[in-house]
């Protein structure tokens, strides 16, 4: 009977050591500034900001569990991975609407281009993030373009 207990004890020790060496646990070292995993995930988001990105894709890219990914994002950004992606998309939409060199046909087109399929929710999130509607941003952009054209024309005369 004591040999059975010893065998069980050693089996548990070996199993524990094997689990500690799995690649899924490697990424659990502390999340520090300049974390290459975090930087790789953020770079992927930036390069694919117009696409639909899943939590599972990001976790696989970071070589960690979705829960560990959440923890890493909370530490670095103060928000969840999906909120971070949505906020980056909103910032890109705002940049498009504010850019005087961008030829914008409609806000709907820009929103859809960045993956916002429900326009009501898009407008609500945009307003809660920036304090104005997308149409307000576009109107300000158009007014700035008109003002800059008028000032450049008046400088010619």
From Swiss-Prot:
Cellular component terms per the entry's GO annotation: cytoplasm
First-listed, main subcellular location of the protein, grouped into a coarse class: cytoplasm
Keywords for the protein's UniProt record, in alphabetical order: Activator, Aromatic hydrocarbons catabolism, Cytoplasm, DNA-binding, Plasmid, Transcription, Transcription regulation
DNA-binding region(s) in UniProt: 56-77, 107-130
Domain of life according to the entry: Bacteria
A single MF term (Gene Ontology): sequence-specific DNA binding
Record domain HTH araC/xylS-type: where: 39-140
Function: Regulatory protein of the TOL plasmid xyl operons. XylS activates the xylXYZLTEGFJQKIH operon required for the degradation of toluene, m-xylene and p-xylene.
Protein's name according to its UniProt entry: XylDLEGF operon transcriptional activator 2
Organism annotation: Pseudomonas putida
């Amino acid at each position: 009977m004591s040999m059975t207990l010893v065998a069980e004890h050693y089996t548990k020790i070996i199993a524990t050591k094997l689990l500690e060496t799995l690649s899924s646990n490697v990424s659990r070292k502390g999340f520090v500034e300049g974390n290459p995993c975090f930087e790789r995930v953020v770079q992927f988001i930036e390069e694919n900001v117009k696409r639909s990105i899943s939590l599972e894709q990001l976790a696989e890219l970071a070589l960690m569990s979705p829960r560990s990914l959440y923890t890493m994002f909370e530490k670095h950004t103060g928000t969840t991975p999906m909120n971070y992606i949505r906020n980056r998309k909103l910032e890109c939409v705002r940049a498009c609407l504010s850019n005087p060199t961008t030829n914008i046909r409609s806000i709907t087109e820009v929103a859809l281009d960045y993956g916002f399929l429900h326009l009501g929710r898009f407008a609500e999130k945009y307003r809660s993030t920036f304090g104005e509607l997308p149409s307000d941003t576009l109107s300000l952009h158009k007014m700035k373009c008109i003002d800059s054209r008028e000032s450049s024309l008046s400088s010619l005369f």
